[in-house]
């Protein structure tokens, strides 16, 4: 059982345990020890998003890592996938991201990438925790010239912009395309506009003035209504919204209608099937994806493999099965041929390339998938108790599942990063499943709800 790490690294309110400077330094020391192999100089990349607390945690991590005799390459604000890319391209021993993704500014987090740019498996995170709580490394104190150094990589943004542009087909450009872009006042506020503009698009930017406290504040992928209204106002071709660390992306079409991750996966999977580029004709998605995605991919000659929720589990399944496309309904998209993790800007470029190649609007491409009605309700809880051990709740869920039969499903799971129970229902009748979802939520609230 992990004590610090959740589904996406260590996360919490900044300056409150476990997201304190003291713990960040300990995490840095443990990680530096773990990633050292052989008698040579080692290097770890550190990047962050635009949160105020990023400075505090960055310095603590740098101090911890250097105190173990490992050098640090500091890249500053950069999208999470950009940090993974820089880690791999600079042949560093590991990468560290300081970000809480789509969470509000007061939260922050720490997560790691291995030297090849992939997120760490659970066993590596457990080893970091063991080194911290066992005290095994407390007495290890390199001295004199063995202490690590910190270097700032000033051209990290430029390096990543070049990488992203190189992922776009050389025979295509975005000339004549008007794009509304919301960077959530987050890590992509420089990168994303630069990439789209250099490829020829007219960019109408939102969320590109971070001040440390406005990341994800009424903007970004959690607030698609912002780009929806802007697309209609500016008569743009589409809208693109990233989250705070730019590892996920949500679109709206030319009419302002949201196009979620499931639709994007359907668009990309069917296009790759046509081009015979989808490995093993298989798309990897999570259990949260709409059943309409399975139907669309099957109709195009492919299949969908499902995993637990979390882009790390999608990537693990992709590596294990030898697949090259995966993602989540929330907007995490993983293209393993050019990248190693979810990348909002790269995913947007893949969709834009498909639009250009097919000479179709986003609304036309999105017609490839017809989603089943789906309802998602979040209930804040005081404890993450196994739902099957609450008789009344388990009985109610069982009764509703019988009524749904083969024409729908219920998925109940706890958030890996927040004290929330997520209740998702899918079925043919939106009104009916909305009522059932509320019925379950009300009962859960009564039994284990928390303010």
UniProtKB/Swiss-Prot annotation:
PTM comment: Activated by phosphorylation.
Tagged with keyword Magnesium: yes
An annotated Gene Ontology molecular function: phosphomannomutase activity
Any matching Pfam family: PGM_PMM_IV
Modified residues (Phosphoserine): 101
Named cofactor requirement(s): Mg(2+)
Domain of life (superkingdom): Bacteria
Sites where the protein binds Mg(2+): 101, 243, 245, 247
Keywords: Isomerase, Magnesium, Metal-binding, Phosphoprotein
Family: Belongs to the phosphohexose mutase family.
Protein name (database record): Phosphoglucosamine mutase
Enzyme Commission number(s): 5.4.2.10
Active site: 101 (phosphoserine intermediate)
GO CC, one annotated term: cytosol
Organism: Geobacter sulfurreducens (strain ATCC 51573 / DSM 12127 / PCA)
UniProt record, GO biological process: carbohydrate metabolic process; peptidoglycan biosynthetic process; UDP-N-acetylglucosamine biosynthetic process
Cofactor note: Binds 1 Mg(2+) ion per subunit.
Enzyme class, spelled out: isomerase
Substrates-to-products reaction catalysed: alpha-D-glucosamine 1-phosphate = D-glucosamine 6-phosphate
Summary of the function given for this chain in its UniProt record: Catalyzes the conversion of glucosamine-6-phosphate to glucosamine-1-phosphate.
CDD domains per record: GlmM (cd05802)
InterPro entries xref list: A-D-PHexomutase_a/b/a-I, A-D-PHexomutase_a/b/a-I/II/III, A-D-PHexomutase_a/b/a-II, A-D-PHexomutase_a/b/a-III, A-D-PHexomutase_C, A-D-PHexomutase_C_sf, A-D-PHexomutase_CS, Alpha-D-phosphohexomutase_SF
SUPFAM superfamilies, sorted: Phosphoglucomutase, C-terminal domain (SSF55957), Phosphoglucomutase, first 3 domains (SSF53738)
